[in-house]
Amino acid sequence: MQVKETVADGLKREFEVTLQAADIGAKVAARLDDMKDKVRLNGFRPGKVPIGHLKRIYGRSVTAETVEKLIRETNDQIFTERGFRLATEPKITMPSKENEVEEILAGKSDLNYTVAVEVVPTIELADFKSFSVEKPVAEVADSDVDEAINRIAMGNRSYADKGEGAKAESGDRVTISFKGTIDGTPFDGGTGEGIQVVIGSATFIPGFEDQLIGIGAGETRTLKVEFPKNYTNAELAGKPAEFETTATVLEAPQESVIDDEFAKTLGFESLDKLKEAARGRLTAEYAGATRQRVKRVLLDRLDETHRFEAPPSLVEQEFDLMWRSIKAEMESGGKTFESENTTEEAAKEEYRKIADRRVRLGLVLSEIGEKNKITVTDDEVSRAVIERARQMPGHEKEVWEYYRNNAEALAQLRAPIYEDKVVDFILELANVTEKTVSREELYKDDDAEKTAA
């Protein structure tokens, strides 16, 4: 075996490899010798088939099988001796001329091939004990609990007919029928019958609900509006429209009395039990938000302290996945790059940066996990599957079967568990300080937020 490195460009490596015909022949002979005691041929006793006869019958297929195995073993040896961790599957270029292939299979010629790969860079991990991470913590206030219960009450409130001669006010529920036109022409989706709308709920396009204030039952009005420029249907986006609208029923919201009886309608023994449940849910929500903020800060820190070239092929794969998703989302929502105030080139550049970050962080997290023997147990994966099944009542068996028979889906379920365990490992070493914040501060938008790995 002869190996010559021909390319060492960044993370790209390429080798020219020669496997001598004599070495291939020796492997073929050993394989045929092993076969002679197992092959059954008419006219020969078991174990008495001449090697020459076997070679005439099986020589070509055995040689091809042997060459394939030798290439695999040789490549493994090349990569192992050099300490390579592969980022991509090896790309092998074999002789293509028919006469060359025939010479190799006949054992008359050496096999010359090239193998090209991208390797994972050597990653020098930072000292995680030097990391300082601020952990925002928000306490659940009584006012938060009251607000949550008020929202529940608002969502469950009843409405009563306002009676003859009444006019619609903000907060009222109005049942309407409408016919929409653009430049006098009806359009798809512009007609509705018996539609209920709560004035002020912002469920209709801007300006529509406000023009219902003062309308009476049986009254017809022409509402003039303009579809938002980022409207989901691109054919309607930014266009002015008129809706001939008739109100058929006017209803006023009834005040909800938040007491034990109200709690019982929701399945709780008392108002105190309802408040207890609401506090527990809010506590879990705040803890989840805290976790996401801490994780984001930590991933940003890992990004800052681990700057290296990511394997281009992995970045391209990640970008392709993201870009297909973005394009599909834009098409389904009727959006364009112009409506999003950008260009396709600028968007691609931004998402390539995100793809590069994701790949680098993925490699860093993998390196940390590998060096510190962090693993995901089968029990942890099973619990995740069970939790996913609980989210789909009535389809638990189908969910379980889906993951049991889909290795890729199971790997996708395992990945975030692994990531969280690595994050927890780093946080154990880092200097984490808690900071009490308000609910608003905990949930505020962070302009510096970056897409996590």
UniProtKB/Swiss-Prot annotation:
Disulfide bond residue pairs: none
Keyword field contains Cell cycle: yes
MF GO annotations: peptidyl-prolyl cis-trans isomerase activity; protein folding chaperone; ribosome binding
PROSITE patterns from the UniProt entry: FKBP_PPIASE
Keyword flag Cell division: yes
GO biological process: 'de novo' cotranslational protein folding; cell division; chaperone-mediated protein folding; protein transport; protein unfolding
Alphabetized UniProt keyword annotations: Cell cycle, Cell division, Chaperone, Cytoplasm, Isomerase, Rotamase
EC number: 5.2.1.8
Domain of life per record: Bacteria
Classification via InterPro entries: PPIase_dom_sf, PPIase_FKBP_dom, Trig_fac, Trigger_fac_C, Trigger_fac_C_sf, Trigger_fac_ribosome-bd_bac, Trigger_fac_ribosome-bd_sf, Trigger_fact/SurA_dom_sf
Record's subcellular location: Cytoplasm
Residue ranges of domain PPIase FKBP-type in the record: 171-256
Pfam families for the chain: FKBP_C, Trigger_C, Trigger_N
Catalytic activity of the protein: [protein]-peptidylproline (omega=180) = [protein]-peptidylproline (omega=0)
HAMAP family per record: Trigger_factor_Tig
Comment field on protein domains: Consists of 3 domains; the N-terminus binds the ribosome, the middle domain has PPIase activity, while the C-terminus has intrinsic chaperone activity on its own.
Family of the protein in this entry: Belongs to the FKBP-type PPIase family. Tig subfamily.
Function: Involved in protein export. Acts as a chaperone by maintaining the newly synthesized protein in an open conformation. Functions as a peptidyl-prolyl cis-trans isomerase.
This protein's name: Trigger factor
Lineage: Bacteria, Pseudomonadati, Pseudomonadota, Alphaproteobacteria, Hyphomicrobiales
